[in-house]
């Protein structure tokens, strides 16, 4: 049996989602190991003690622990200055406010509405940029939309009511894509000794 790189992932995690999107787009075959975060596999913890997903172990033993670095490796993606700026804002300021909007009870002294408003500054800027040309590359869209999706899903009625037509259209296109459907295929948590699960699966198996 042909050896394959191993990807430890968690289906709903936006960081893991962006890594899987790159893998699907490129047709980069891996063995997918779905993780239960409260019971992380021993092998995953051995190769990546920080214990977060995604983790990609290459055939030569190299371990890539950051989602953006996995995207760059799989896609051979060299970010432009604009792309790097958007990813930095997404992973920095937006993710900071997203976490406090979605999980206010995890943080002391947090006002949920305040963080929704602060996150909306980024989303409004994103809406403006999406109305311009040239449009975002698939790689950049895939790096960003899982986090916007998470924000939108927390209160979809509120999100849909905002004056962000370009953002709404972009997100819906991302979610309706064949690549996203293949990225989000449901699998059972991995257990040691089971038959390996190839990812992405052949199109006809979804």
Predicted features and spans:
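Surface-exposed helix-capping loop/turn segments at secondary-structure junctions
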Residues: 128-137, 178-184
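Short, flexible loop/turn segments with low-complexity composition
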Residues: 80-86, 181-191
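GST superfamily/GST-like fold recognition
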Residues: 135-160
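Acidic, serine/threonine/proline-rich low-complexity intrinsically disordered regions
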Residues: 109-114, 155-162
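Acidic/histidine-enriched, glycine/proline-rich intrinsically disordered or flexible terminal extensions
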Residues: 187-206
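Extended, well-ordered alpha-helical scaffold segments
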Residues: 114-122, 162-176
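GST-like domain detector, emphasizing the conserved glutathione-binding G-site
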Residues: 1-122, 129-134
């Amino acid at each position: 049996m042909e050896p394959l790189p191993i990807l430890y992932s968690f289906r709903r995690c936006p960081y893991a989602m962006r890594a899987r999107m790159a893998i699907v787009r490129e047709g980069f075959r891996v063995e997918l190991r779905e993780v239960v975060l409260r019971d992380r596999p021993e092998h995953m913890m051995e190769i990546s003690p920080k214990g977060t997903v995604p983790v990609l172990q290459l055939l030569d033993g190299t371990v890539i622990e950051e989602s953006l670095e996995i995207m760059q490796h799989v896609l051979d993606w060299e970010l432009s200055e604009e792309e790097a700026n958007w990813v930095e804002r997404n992973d920095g300021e937006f993710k900071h406010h997203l976490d406090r909007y979605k999980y206010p009870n995890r943080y002391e002294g947090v006002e949920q509405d305040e963080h929704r408003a602060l996150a909306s500054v980024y989303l409004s800027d994103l809406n403006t940029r999406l109305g311009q040309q040239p449009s975002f590359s698939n790689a950049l869209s895939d790096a960003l939309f899982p986090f916007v999706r998470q924000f939108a899903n927390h209160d979809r009625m509120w999100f849909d009511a905002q004056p962000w037509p370009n953002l709404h259209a972009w997100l819906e296109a991302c979610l309706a894509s064949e690549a996203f459907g293949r990225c989000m295929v449901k699998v059972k948590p991995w257990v040691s000794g089971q038959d390996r699960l190839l990812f992405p699966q052949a199109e006809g198996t979804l």
